[in-house]
């Protein structure tokens, strides 16, 4: 998710 990665 946006909390640990940048795929959101």
Swiss-Prot record:
Subcellular location: Secreted
UniProt note on tissues of expression: Expressed by the venom duct.
Modified residues annotated as Cysteine amide in this record: 8
GO molecular function: ion channel regulator activity; toxin activity
Main location: secreted
GO cellular component: a single term: extracellular region
Disulfide bond annotation, renumbered to this chain: 2-8
Alphabetized UniProt keyword annotations: Amidation, Disulfide bond, Ion channel impairing toxin, Secreted, Toxin
Superkingdom: Eukaryota
Function, in words: Its target is unknown, but this toxin may modulate voltage-activated calcium channels (Cav) or calcium-dependent potassium channels (KCa).
Comment, domains: The cysteine framework is C-C.
Family: Belongs to the O2 superfamily. Contryphan family.
Official protein name in the record: Contryphan Li981
């Amino acid at each position: 998710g946006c909390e640990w990665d940048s795929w959101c």
